[in-house]
Amino acid sequence: MNKQGNTYTFLYSVVLVVVVAALLSIVSLSLQPRQNENRENEKRQNILSAIHISSTAENSAELFGKYIKEQFIVNTQGEKIEGNAFNVNIEKQYNLPVEKRELPVFVADVDGATKYILPIYGAGLWGPIWGYISLDDNKNTVYGTFFDHQGETPGLGAEITTPKFNEEFRNKQIFSGNQLVGIEVIKGGNATGANQVDAISGGTITSKGVESMIKNYLTYYEPFLKQR
């Protein structure tokens, strides 16, 4: 075959593309277990953060097993359903009709006190925001939160990840009597109510996104939260 001809060049290019694609596929498959492990460790760390437990990729599995005593899924009627709570993808659930969503519940024991940890997901200014909120045994008082985001503005909306902002939610109440009210994020440093926290300066839209995210997801969990 003429190595200077178009046919040779074409066949050579095809073979090269196939070989490179095969190598990339092999590399991707070999890395997948490690990538899955990293995602699971990060998820454990985030859940633990909502109950004020610091962890690393190296010890997150151990600490998760130490503090998380039970995990299960409920539906929007508050009924337990079959499934693995840890494996539920909240981002995918967010796009399903509400009545079809699976709602994970993680039950922790912190110094002998029961805490309920619930995942939450919503929209910020520039993209999705998500996190976890933990409640005391009364399913009303906030024990802790963890928030993260995809693309909020550094120094503004991205401040939802800071300990300062998260600490504001501690000991706030999500119910007023028997009515679910969520947590109101107030602009201007005027948060004095039992269910109010201060908004991030310059990050009003993201702050309101956090407020909506918490209220919406707690509404899905409301039948479960009202079980005593």
Regions found by a protein language model. Give the residues of each.
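Flexible, solvent-exposed loop/hinge segments and secondary-structure transition points
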Residues: 2-228
